[in-house]
């Protein structure tokens, strides 16, 4: 009998949410996603020290200014890890733009161009890359321009329907609505526990998925940030699910029988008039959970980016 992970793969494209190359070898996902926190974690694995050494050496050929070298080494390391992962997955790698640029459209676009160039210099076509951006208004606007250039984007830190709708209207390739972090907020706010079917994160992703399919949007829905396999099983049938190694292992060790919970709409209705910036900001602001979790997510990614840069600075200063 097929284990739960194998069953899930028949309904949903499975993506590994990790920078750990060994974990990717083990679970054979279609795609992989990274973020500043996962890059920091991967950078501390001794087997990957050669990827850091390569990034440091490359950065030193690009500039004599230490701050620029740190920036270059950080970008190159993320790409080096991505290149290694792409040797193992048939699909795409998601690489994230510096979270500190989340409110700067032009700098986000420039950073995306740099990451794509570094991948291309390593022999990787842009068709195998997704540029990850936070789902701020500025991030969504940056993604809209990048998509028009043929650079596909993954809009992350997505906690609200307003963010999801704006992403679809911008023609974004893929969104990553966060399930577990929504659950965290509601558990803390209400003091309640939630069964997977009533999990606020599961409910949010289901609503977004149904809206996209009903309105004929092509934007891929990739549920992310899971706290337990119950959430994952409730979202079987979602376009994609990005799952960390510990939950992939739990799914692989489970024999639970599952079925598709999310199904594409049989009929579609016309899309609504796109949100204006003012409407987006108002609708988003009406959701305290989304406001708090987006801000927290950006801050935490920025903290881990800073820790990575401290590590790189020490190596560059030797």
Swiss-Prot record:
One of its GO terms (molecular function) is transaldolase activity. InterPro entries: Aldolase_TIM (IPR013785), TAL/FSA (IPR001585), Transaldolase_1 (IPR004730), Transaldolase_AS (IPR018225). Keywords: Cytoplasm, Pentose shunt, Schiff base, Transferase. CDD domains: Transaldolase_TalAB. It catalyses: D-sedoheptulose 7-phosphate + D-glyceraldehyde 3-phosphate = D-erythrose 4-phosphate + beta-D-fructose 6-phosphate. Homodimer. Transaldolase is important for the balance of metabolites in the pentose-phosphate pathway. This is Transaldolase. It comes from Shewanella sp. (strain W3-18-1). The lineage of its organism: Bacteria, Pseudomonadati, Pseudomonadota, Gammaproteobacteria, Alteromonadales.
């Amino acid at each position: 009998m097929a284990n739960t992970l194998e069953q899930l793969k028949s309904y949903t494209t499975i993506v590994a949410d990790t920078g750990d190359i060994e974990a990717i070898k083990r679970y054979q996902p279609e795609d992989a996603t990274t973020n500043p926190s996962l890059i920091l974690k991967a950078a501390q694995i001794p087997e990957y020290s050669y990827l850091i050494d390569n990034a440091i050496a490359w950065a030193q050929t690009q500039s004599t200014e230490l701050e620029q070298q740190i920036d270059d080494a950080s970008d190159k390391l993320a790409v080096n890890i991505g290149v290694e992962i792409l040797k193992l997955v048939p699909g795409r790698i998601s690489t994230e733009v510096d979270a500190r640029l989340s409110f700067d459209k032009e700098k986000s676009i420039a950073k995306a161009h740099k990451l794509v160039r570094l991948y291309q210099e390593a022999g990787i076509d842009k068709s195998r890359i997704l540029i990850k951006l936070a789902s701020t208004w500025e991030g969504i606007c940056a993604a809209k321009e990048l998509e028009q250039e043929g650079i596909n984007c993954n809009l992350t830190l997505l906690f609200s329907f307003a963010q999801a709708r704006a992403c679809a209207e911008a023609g974004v390739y893929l969104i990553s609505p966060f399930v577990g972090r929504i659950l965290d907020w509601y558990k803390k706010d209400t003091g309640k526990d939630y069964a997977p079917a009533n999990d606020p994160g599961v409910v949010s992703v289901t609503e977004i998925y149904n809206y996209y399919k009903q309105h004929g949007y092509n934007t891929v829905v990739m549920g992310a940030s899971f706290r337990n396999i119950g959430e994952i099983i409730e979202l079987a049938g979602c376009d994609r699910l990005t799952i960390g190694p510990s939950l992939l292992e739990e799914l692989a060790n489970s024999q639970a029988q599952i079925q598709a919970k999310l199904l594409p709409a049989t009929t579609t209705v016309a899309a609504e008039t796109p949100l204006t910036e003012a409407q987006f900001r108002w609708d988003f602001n009406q959701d305290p959970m989304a406001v708090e979790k987006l801000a927290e997510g950006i801050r935490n990614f920025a903290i881990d980016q800073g820790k990575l840069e401290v590590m790189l600075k020490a190596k560059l200063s030797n």
